[in-house]
Amino acid sequence: VAQKEDNKAAVVEVNSETDFVASNATFKAYVQKVADAALETKAADLEGFLADKWPEDPSKTVSESLVDMIAVISEKLSIRRFEQVEAANGIVASYVHGGGRIAVLVEADTDVVNDEIREAVRNVAMQVAALSPKYVGEEDIPEEVRAHEKEILLAQAVAENEALPENKRKPQQILEKMLIGRLNKEFKEICLNDQIYVKAEDGKQSVAAYLAEVGK
């Protein structure tokens, strides 16, 4: 991860074949240089980025710098992807976990930037690293995903119901209520705003509620 002030950051994925190399100081230093280059690139895709001039030696490309590092490390390496995030009205925070195996960038809109806001957005980045939400809010879930999840949960509910003795089976309207409850629970687990905040003192506060509290 590389960051410029509060509003711009970049993250890169550079793969090695072994954990030994992944923890190597020379490799880590190179990955940081790649991230620094990704922070400044104007490239729209990986192919364009790899063709960029290597900041440390402009006579070479980023791709050629990788070839040089492979020769030093004596192991196959690859630059797999990069992302660059720039906040137009707010800040970008980063969080790196597991010795660099997981990296998260979070962009937040805010009119106020101070240490409390920076910490809050970084805490949200930590939340993403820990619980891997798929969407920001429930409104972001595509209809086809909703339909697929509903189909799966309905099949489970019907199977569970049919496995019961006939005199204990639930009527259709009860199954439908159960389905709504299960869907809501499922969506809360995959949507960042609705997830329980990992540092919630009461174990109940959602991420959205935490941010609302910080923003007061």
Protein language model regions, located:
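N-terminal assembly/interaction segments in proteins that build large macromolecular machines
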Residues: V1-K216
